[in-house]
Amino acid sequence: MTTGFLQKIFGSRNQRLVKQYQKTVAAINALETQIETLTDDQLRGKTGEFRQRIAAGESLDKLLPEAFAVCREASRRVLKMRHFDVQMIGGMVLHYGKIAEMRTGEGKTLVATLAAYLNALAGRGVHVVTVNDYLAQRDAEWMGRLYNFLGLSVGINLSGMEHDQKQAAYAADITYGTNNEFGFDYLRDNMVYETDSRVQRPLNFAVVDEVDSILIDEARTPLIISGQAEDHTELYVRMNALPPLLERQIGEEKADGTGVEKPGDYTLDEKGRQVFLTESGHEKAERMLAEWGLIGDGESLYAPQNITLMHHVYAALRAHTLFHRDQHYVVQNDEVIIVDEFTGRLMPGRRWSDGLHQAVEAKEHVKIQSENQTLASITFQNYFRMYAKLSGMTGTADTEAYEFNEIYGLETVVIPTNRPPKRIDKQDQIYKTAKERYDAVIRDIRECHERGQPVLVGTTSIENSELLSHLLKQAGLPHEVLNAKQHAREAAIVAEAGRPKRITIATNMAGRGTDIVLGGNVEKQAAFIEADESIPADEKARRIQQLHDEWETLHEQVKTAGGLHIIGTERHESRRIDNQLRGRAGRQGDPGSSRFYLSLEDPLLRIFAGDRVRAIMDRLKMPEGEAIEAGIVTRSIESAQRKVEARNFDIRKQLLEYDDVSNDQRKVIYQQRNELLEAHDIAETIGAMRHGVISEVVRQFVPAGSIEEQWDLPELEETLRNDWQLDLAIQEMVNESSSINADEILDAVTTAADEHYEAKVALVGRESFSAFERSIMLQTLDRLWREHLAALDHLRQGIHLRGYAQKNPKQEYKREAFELFAAMLDAVKQEVTRIVMNVQIQSPEQLEEAAEQIEEQGGQLGNVEFQHADFAAAAAAATAGGAVVADATAEMVGHAMSHSGPAGEVPRVGRNDPCPCGSGKKYKHCHGKLN
């Protein structure tokens, strides 16, 4: 109450910021007359002048009014578009490292040019990040004319580009590209073996378009570069026969034995999207697997030798019960392609992790691709936080403002519209059944069609969009369907969605990034005419003028009919996605309207609010086909959405806390790699490692401060001779000197190791040997880092079970991950020292051969894939401790079974200690063994 009273007097934080920025806009407008008098060359020359002033110490903030005025004037001349005052405010918000929320149609693409131009003047690079290649290419070509006019270079970073093209794109002043490609390039840069092979510069400033989609919807899933691992194709095919033999149990058994309506083999929790085998399900699964010869008669699925089978059972079960064709994925060209749950777009190349994708492939009887081993991974949360300055734009950020601030430290500023919005958002209508809902939708569409009003219908899945398309065909209503299957025609369909009587069905936010202009997008049609070389120039001009005249008539016709009408056929889990759909109408002060039609059979209502709404309908004795249209129901639905959003935020926050652990380790490894790549000579590093390793070897047999009776000299001599190529008569040395102590023995062995090393260097020369050492160090570091990532995955998937032992899973994960990391660094030292001490060379040519041989033996993985992984696996770890219910609890259970046990405490690994990888072998026979 006090807050509201103070806001009335002083205004909200948002209002105060906008008012502050408006003063700067006034200063920019005051410069406009002066800037307009400049010739094109003088205007272009301002860029060089600004750069000199920056070099002399002037700040970007001080340059802002003049730079924005120059950018606006250049845009007016080149693009025939003058930035509105509100767009100037948007540009300032981006420059100051905040998020600008701007309504659809307010010109976000043009706003980005202001902040990009100003920050590019510093010469450290600006990345403009979009959600797909089409938008990156469109914006780079469209806005590139403006930047080129002002003397700045523009690069486009697309997937599949050649290495030198990427280097050129990143060297440009402003680089357009997709979030995935920027992230993958960062990972690839940290896998190279030569400094010249890197493409990125240090991450300076990023403007993220559709920031909510990239930093929130996509943040939960990591980017993964992977290579093929062991092949279990046959096992997936065998396991695929199991789920159809199992029956679902209806109801959960309570403590008193009641609650089960229909006994079965597995339970399904739709709210948490979990699946669990019941006791009878376990017995039936074990019986079937024994019949198929996959386990022995009477054996348990939990027996150590059957651990991996449990993982495959759950993968198959999840594939059959939780993942549905044309909703979660489509099958095209003998391939399972994931459908993005937020945008409805197809995501070719992206695969679910941990065997789920293979299980779905087996279910659909398409070719099963091999499982992969992770080579490198990073989440968008951690990638984008590495930029020195980060900003973003979207039409819907305010509902997630808390998360942006909490995770990324980004403040959200709502930018006023250039013209007052005229869209009318009508009350939701709720029906008892989906059939009644669709009947009402068809009625509404028919009414709009008859009065010439264009309609955009939003659905939540491909399946629903095709069902609605079928109903419209039956009703004789012509329409266009825009879902993942029509991806190639997306821009063309959206461009025409504002024409009179046009009916367009869109899956979620497919087509985002292209404006729906009332009367149709005349610029798109004009571009097609311009591109047609067979039409003479004067004929082109005549046709384009005719198009503009026709558009004026159509535009007025649609405005009179009420503008674009938005129909939502289902509420999404997130209010933000609903707002994005609504936001397609009423652009730039145009009229428009929106309404959501819901049914009690919708997942959101059924899971969160169905019983309450059904009770209201029963109490009111609602006849069939009659809808509830009440504020209390809409508020109830929004409350359910807030619960889901809060749950998803908790998942993302917990995921980040887990990922921060591996992120800190990733930074250490990548920093060490970069130092190795840039160092001219790493002899000092190799020497320090050698001394540490030799000291550890000697101390195993001759402990510090011990007496002669405690020494095991024969074993020490044998170990040095077999493992380190050092032939020393230590027993003889001790016999000859009665006063020798443990430290002197260590000194003698260290000196011998140094001499052995120097003799190798002398044979081939310091420069050649240094290159060999660098190569071996990088290969060993990369291989052990890969194995470490796999170990962290296993640790994370089973860590939630520590909660049952009254331990904090998060703290346990941090502790054990650190111990694994320390063991990995020790293993790197051991292995590099072992290779350098054992390599037999006589010439530089032999040295190159040895390096190649070690690389082959190191198991370089082929068929490298770049994936933006599925949320399911990531959420599994985030929900550790049971604080939050996630999409993939079944996956957690499956992997808890497949994990061979918690990582042991290994502060330092001795030769005879168990190997920290969990194989059960001694370290010297496992990761301590020379390949």
From Swiss-Prot:
UniProt keyword Glycoprotein, yes or no: no
Gene Ontology terms describing biological process: intracellular protein transmembrane transport; protein import; protein targeting; protein transport by the Sec complex
Main subcellular location of this protein, as a coarse class: membrane
Enzyme Commission designation: 7.4.2.8
Listed transmembrane segments: none
Listed SUPFAM superfamilies: Helical scaffold and wing domains of SecA, P-loop containing nucleoside triphosphate hydrolases, Pre-protein crosslinking domain of SecA
Keyword match Ligase: no
Binding site for ATP: Q87, G105, E106, G107, K108, T109, D515
Localisation: Cell inner membrane; Cytoplasm
GO cellular component, one term: cytosol
Keywords associated with the record: ATP-binding, Cell inner membrane, Cell membrane, Cytoplasm, Membrane, Metal-binding, Nucleotide-binding, Protein transport, Translocase, Translocation, Transport, Zinc
Essential cofactor(s): Zn(2+)
Gene Ontology molecular function, alphabetical: ATP binding; metal ion binding; protein-exporting ATPase activity
Cofactor: record remark: May bind 1 zinc ion per subunit.
PROSITE patterns hit by this protein: SECA, SECA_MOTOR_DEAD
InterPro entries linked: Helicase_ATP-bd, Helicase_C-like, P-loop_NTPase, SEC_C_motif, SecA, SecA_CS, SecA_DEAD, SecA_motor_DEAD
Record field: catalytic activity: ATP + H2O + cellular proteinSide 1 = ADP + phosphate + cellular proteinSide 2
Top EC class, one word: translocase
Membrane-topology annotation of the record: Peripheral membrane protein
Residues the record lists as binding Zn(2+): C915, C917, C926, H927
NCBIfam families given in the database record: PRK12904.1, secA
Family recorded in the similarity comment: Belongs to the SecA family.
Function summary: Part of the Sec protein translocase complex. Interacts with the SecYEG preprotein conducting channel. Has a central role in coupling the hydrolysis of ATP to the transfer of proteins into and across the cell membrane, serving both as a receptor for the preprotein-SecB complex and as an ATP-driven molecular motor driving the stepwise translocation of polypeptide chains across the membrane.
Description of how the protein assembles with itself and partners: Monomer and homodimer. Part of the essential Sec protein translocation apparatus which comprises SecA, SecYEG and auxiliary proteins SecDF-YajC and YidC.
Listed name of the protein: Protein translocase subunit SecA
Organism field: Burkholderia mallei (strain ATCC 23344)
